[in-house]
Amino acid sequence: MNLHITKSKNAESFYICKSYTKANGSTTSAIVRKLGTLEQLLPEHGPTRDDVLAWAKNEVKIETEKYKKEKEAQTVLIPFHADRQLDYNKQVFFRGGYLFLQSFYYQLQMNKTCRKLKQKYKFKYDINAILSDLIYAKILEPCSKRSSYKVASEFLEKPSYELHDVYRALDVLGTECDLIQAEVYKNSHFLGKRNDKILYYDCSNYYFEIEQEDGNKKYGKSKEHRPNPIIQMGLFMDGDGIPLAFSLFPRNANEQISLKPLEKKVLEDFGCQKFIYCSDAGLGSESIREYNHMGERAYIVTQSIKKLKKDEKEWALNPQGFKRVSDDAPVDITKISEDDKGLYYKDEPYTTKKLHQRLIITYSPKYALYQKSIRDKQIERAQKMLDSGNTKKNRKNPNDPARFIGTLAVTKEGEAADVKHYLDENKISEEGQYDGFYAVCTDLLDDEVDDILKVSEGRWQIEECFRIMKTDFSARPIYLQDENRIKAHFLICFLALTIYRFLEKKLGSKYTCEKLLDTLKGMNFAEIQEQGFTPLYKREAITDDLHDVCGFRTDYQFITKSKMRNIQKKSKGKE
């Protein structure tokens, strides 16, 4: 509603008008109520014109509130005809799950970051719409960039760009990858304080659907033993499981060299100066520990017991000297039952040439039983291989059951050797001695063991980050060739993961990844005779929670077009 004033030769008239959109998309207005002329209104609402104007504006406000209440309470009657066919090429299905992701996209002020890019490069296409749609599609329907454009065309808000603009935008996004990461981190504080006093780091590889290595895409060993060229991604994550920063490097390069350039970026561009670095043993070399011992930084890294010196290994595996983590009570771990749920530890100073450290050994009967059960199954498979004569020549995988098969060459003088295979009991016994044991090394000499172990246990979240990107967001295989566009691909995956993690955190981590993603994918709408929309999803506790954390609701039996536009505005932080 708005106040409309007309002036003629004889009078000044005041009207309350309502604007609306016609079927062809044009806007017009209609008079809702005539308030009267200035001459008529002055005696009751004067004595001045300003007094009349103030009264008239208040009447508009009252009329607007009245209209809204009537609109919300009204019953909508829309005629359908059983003998009328559907219109050609008329879209009636619309995806709406992106609205909840959009709420976090705009809270991260990524639209403002895109505005900076537009001012810098002077392009005409809408990079904010392109980036946001690519992120939403990555979460809701992971597919190629071309297919993502088709997915976006099913959103309630249509793409305001063409497909060729998407590929142009990828070049810019790849070039400005570091800037965007820094901006997202800075703006993420609008969503609450970041737990950036603990930073986890890990690497994972991604393969390409190409035959020849090129640039950063190098041949290398992957867990799946694929022959395709591979690139590695290094990822920093905060203590709440939310991504912080990433970098890319060739697979044939040592993953340890990936850390320092990215950590330097975190130190300088993000302003994170005081934190505990946490990683697995593969990314916890002596040089990495020294690097994270500088300034206000510290480290907690896993330590391979097998790689300890002889006397340190003997101390670690000795059952004496352990204490219960919960109360520090001394315990002889040889006397506790297999089904004991407790965790036990011992620690000692662990000094190298340059570092004064602390080595913490833990023992878990539950973990020991788990490791033994896994190995027993592998031994069974090894025995079956021996019985069938199907033994492997190459046993490079540390989890391959064939590692338990020994080879013995028996020969008589002057004759060729007979090769015999057998179950290697010594190998089995050697592995068994490590069951249940785990080691952590840190330069936090005075902190409580329980606190140190809790930080180390949080590493599962960064492993889950990679799993979500690879499995749920289909970050691999990669079909792009250009280096900048490859960077943009990973940037989109990174941003999708960041938004997903913030949403997950806001929901209190109540729901599994599968449940949350399935719910978002299912929150769709059907357009009814161009009058509005009806939800196509089932209302549940999770949909109520999504609406509560995002500050709008879509779970009405019918949503008028004007109300849906208001919902879209709210999802962008506009009232």
Task: For each feature predicted by the language model, list its residue ranges.
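Basic, amphipathic alpha-helical segments enriched in Lys/Arg and hydrophobic/aromatic residues
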Residues: 36, 482-503
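Secondary-structure transition/capping motifs at alpha-helix termini
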Residues: 23-24, 155-161, 192, 239-242, ...
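Acidic, metal-coordinating catalytic cores used for nucleic-acid/nucleotide bond scission
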Residues: 254, 278-287, 305-308, 484-486
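An anionic, glycine-rich sequence signature occurring as long contiguous blocks
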Residues: 231, 245-248, 296-455, 518-575
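Conserved nucleotidyltransferase catalytic core and NTase-mimicking acidic/glycine-rich helix/loop elements
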Residues: 496-497, 502-530
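Dynamic "connector" segments at or just before major functional cores
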Residues: 1-212, 216, 227, 236-247, ...
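Short amphipathic alpha-helical "interface-anchor" segments enriched in bulky aromatics
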Residues: 452-479
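Active-site beta-loop-alpha junctions of metal-dependent nucleic acid enzymes
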Residues: 247-269
